[in-house]
């Protein structure tokens, strides 16, 4: 069981790092070249994308953290 949890933690850490890089690469900073309705639509689309990616990052981070807590519990009960 401990080996499976450690493998899961490692895999989640890899996925988290990839998602954090994707967040930086996919979601550009606010742009000033749009005006009016186009600017509003662009900003809304970016906000939606950022929220979606941030939710994914948070979910994977929470899973990794819960896995770390499970590892600690297994280790404490084994000793």
Describe these PLM feature segments.
Residues 1-79:
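N-terminal secretion-targeting helices of virulence/extracellular proteins
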